[in-house]
Structure formats: C-alpha cells, structure tokens
C-alpha cells in the first residue's frame, strides 16, 4: 500500500472569461471546482490505476470538508489531521486570449499540537505502508526541514520515500537522502548552481545524486520526457506527441503517481519509468488536473520509448 503525504492541499477554482478588465466586475462563463494539491493529484492517479493508497495531511474549515468529500467520493482512504485554520484556495482566471491569472492564498499556519498529531498518524500509517510519496509545498508553521523528518522516520522502518517538492523543502529533504526525487531543469539549476545545456550534463547530475545516496534520482524534461538513474544506469523516457493539450497542470504529479504505482508492484526501473511517462502524458488529455483515464494510459504506455544512455 502507498502512503501519500499531502501537507498543503487546496481547493482549485478555475474561472473562464472572455476578458478580465482591471477594476471592473466580470462575469465568468464557466467555473470548475476541484480538490487540488500535488498529493491529491497523486492519490487520484494511483487510485485510477487500481492500486490502494492512503492520504495523510492537514485539512481545515469548509474547504477541508469539501476535499474530504471529494476523496470519499473517489473512494480514496484518508486520515488527515483536522486543523483550526482554513485549507487554502487557489484561483485561476483563464481568458479567451490564452492568458491565465492566478491568485494563490497563503494557506493556514500549522500549530505545534497539530504537527504532533499528524506525526502520530503518519507513524501509524507508515507501519501499514510499503512506500511513501510526499508531494508539494509545506504549509506555514512546520519548518523547511519537515520532509527531512518524515524521510528519516520512513527510512528507520525500511520504507522507500519518494519526494517531489522544490526550494528549501527539497534542499533540506535531500539531507535525509530520499529514495527518489524529481526536479525539473530549473530546479536542477537551483540545486547545482548551473543551467543544464545538454543531456550529458543531466546524466552527470543524476550520477552525482546517485553517488550521494539517492537510489533513484529523476530529472523531468517536460515535453522531452524524463531521465531516471538507478544502480549506475540512466534511462530516458520519450512519450508520444500529443496533438491537443487540454490541461497540462498535474502532469508531473501524474508522473510520480505512475512511478510509485509501478515500484509498489515490483516493476523494474524501465517499466516504472514507462508507466510514469504514460501517466504524465495521459494527464494532458483531461480537463481536470491530476486525473488520468486508465485506458488512455495503457495505450500511451505502448508508445513510450525507453532508451539507456
């Protein structure tokens, strides 16, 4: 069973308008409300692929109740810590000229008591899990080294920890040597101090990360696919070209979910990378973020090209 850590979930609201004139009232043509947060997306995809998972994290207020309702509706098991604050909302305003304006709420501040309660629940669920996936940013109040603590607790029980985050949360998390990380090209630049200009440089970074003790470092290359290193070998996945991208938000989360699902099933690194790439590509074919159609995933999976570099 996969344990999904979703510390900073959100209600994602998407408004579509013809235009957004500054300082005037605007009437939306459509409104879409979805349970968001990278961990929510991961849980959606793992469940769609037919694997069991449990979500832990923080939820509070009316938004928290809504997210619990969505998880229940999708039959995703969740044991989230109830907090006094209100779970954040993220608003995306899309206009007919193709531009998008986002308003991101700061989110709640987690208290020391809520943090302690979460850790107790995490330790309990950890015993029943085979693999841990932690995705997304950290809420205020718990410190940049919180993922590092979760990784250490998982490693103490021999559970692989897949970390997908950025910034100081990633930098601190790396100190505990998670099993897997998935920075994109810009995040690699932050980690290493230099910009990647070719595949050879990316391969070298992966070897360096593996040499530090990260068992399966991965670099996301966007439309160009992804690179994954394991036991001295580097694999590249190139997914098929998609004619029409409906919504690319959540593709990275879908990638992580596919990889976690495959690893939980005992797949080889190549097989895991293939499913991950297929899930990331399948996500762009859906209107809702972090959602895949298993039949589309299976079809795309056959077309993903895996090579050894």
Label each PLM-derived region with a short phrase.
Residues 1-56, 63-66:
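Glycine-rich phosphate/adenosyl-contacting loop at the front of the ribokinase-like
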Residues 24, 48-129, 298-309:
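Conserved N-terminal subdomain of the carbohydrate kinase-like
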Residues 102-104, 129-136, 164, 182-187:
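Short beta-strands and strand-loop turn motifs
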Residues 108-111, 138-142, 169-171, 190, ...:
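Short, small-residue-enriched loops and turns at beta-alpha junctions
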Residues 111-149, 160:
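Hydrophobic alpha-helical segments and helix pairs
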Residues 145-234:
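Conserved phosphate/ATP/ADP-binding segment of small-molecule kinases
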Residues 171, 199-309:
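Conserved phosphate-binding/catalytic region of the ribokinase-like
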């Amino acid at each position: 069973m996969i344990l999904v850590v979703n510390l900073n979930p959100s209600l994602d609201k998407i408004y579509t308008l013809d235009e957004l004139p500054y300082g005037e009232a605007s009437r939306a043509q459509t409104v879409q409300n979805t349970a968001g947060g990278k961990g929510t997306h991961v849980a959606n995809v793992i469940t769609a692929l037919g694997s069991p998972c449990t979500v832990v994290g923080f939820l509070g207020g009316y938004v928290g109740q809504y997210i619990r309702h969505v998880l229940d509706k999708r039959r995703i098991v969740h044991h989230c810590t109830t907090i006094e604050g209100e779970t954040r909302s993220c608003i995306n305003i899309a206009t007919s000229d193709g531009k998008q304006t986002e308003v991101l709420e700061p989110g709640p501040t987690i208290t020391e008591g809520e943090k302690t309660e979460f850790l107790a629940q995490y330790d309990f669920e950890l015993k029943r899990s085979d693999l841990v996936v932690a995705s997304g940013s950290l809420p205020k109040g718990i410190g940049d080294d919180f993922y590092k603590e979760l990784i250490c607790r998982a490693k103490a029980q021999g559970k692989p920890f897949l970390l997908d985050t950025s910034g100081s949360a990633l930098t601190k998390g790396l100190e505990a040597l998670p099993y897997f990380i998935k920075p994109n090209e810009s995040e690699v630049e932050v980690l290493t101090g230099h910009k990647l200009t070719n595949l050879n440089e990316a391969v070298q970074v992966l070897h360096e990360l593996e040499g530090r003790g990260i068992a399966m470092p991965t670099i996301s290359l966007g439309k160009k696919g992804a690179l994954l290193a394991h036991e001295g070998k580097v694999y590249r996945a190139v997914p098929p070209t998609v004619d029409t991208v409906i919504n690319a938000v959540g593709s990275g989360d879908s990638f992580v979910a596919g990889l976690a699902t495959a690893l939980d099933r005992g797949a080889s690194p190549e097989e895991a990378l293939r499913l991950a790439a297929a899930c990331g590509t399948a996500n762009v074919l859906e209107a809702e973020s972090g959602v895949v159609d298993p039949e589309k995933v299976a079809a795309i999976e056959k077309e993903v090209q895996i090579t050894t570099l």
